[in-house]
């Protein structure tokens, strides 16, 4: 809750609101191997983009806007270049378009619903799971690792991924994933990446 509150407060100071858009992101607490490290963050930024290169993803048939339940991030974003489309899917869980947890207590069904939600976001970007270059999967309970890893091995045998033991945002969520991908395309309006 502290990370969510702090992120919301900082974003307002930077004019990041539901009216101006947020960033695609995943904010999950964890623990660094060094107990002196209290915060760590990875970022990706590109200078010189035109606003028409950036597109936000919603998948309203599956997901609701995040600000409706008090958090501030975009569900996903894609950026078009002259030679490719990059897609960034924020941490996505087993949720419906009313903001409710779907399939509480069932790791298999939550994983399937989460994939359905991610697929809806990718489809909106004109992409599929085949366009993904990497996935990060967050598990609330390490006991679910064997089941979930088996599901991923079967469905995504060639996609690089890492599993992280971390407290997923809501207590009812057992799993969450974020991912990034690239799709080849030709767009003469923009410079190549």
Predicted regions and their residues:
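N-terminal presequence-like segments and the immediate start of the first folded domain
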Residues: 1-134, 138-193
């Amino acid at each position: 809750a502290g990370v969510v509150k702090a992120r919301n407060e900082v974003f307002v100071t930077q004019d990041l609101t539901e009216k101006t858009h947020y960033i695609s992101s995943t904010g999950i607490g964890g623990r660094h191997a060094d107990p002196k490290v209290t915060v760590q963050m990875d970022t990706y930024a590109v200078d010189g983009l035109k606003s028409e290169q950036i597109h936000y993803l919603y998948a309203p048939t599956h997901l609701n806007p995040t600000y409706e339940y008090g958090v501030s991030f975009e569900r996903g974003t894609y950026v078009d270049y002259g030679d490719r489309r990059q897609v960034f899917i924020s941490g996505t869980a087993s949720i419906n378009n009313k903001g409710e947890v779907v399939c509480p207590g069932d790791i298999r069904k939550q994983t399937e619903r989460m994939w359905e939600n991610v697929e809806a976001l990718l489809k909106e970007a004109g992409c599929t799971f085949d366009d993904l270059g990497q996935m990060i999967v967050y598990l609330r309970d390490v006991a679910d690792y064997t089941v979930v890893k088996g599901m991923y091995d079967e469905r995504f045998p060639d996609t690089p991924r890492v599993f992280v033991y971390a407290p997923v945002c809501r207590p009812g969520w057992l799993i969450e994933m974020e991912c990034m991908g690239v799709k080849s395309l030709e767009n003469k309006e923009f410079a190549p990446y």
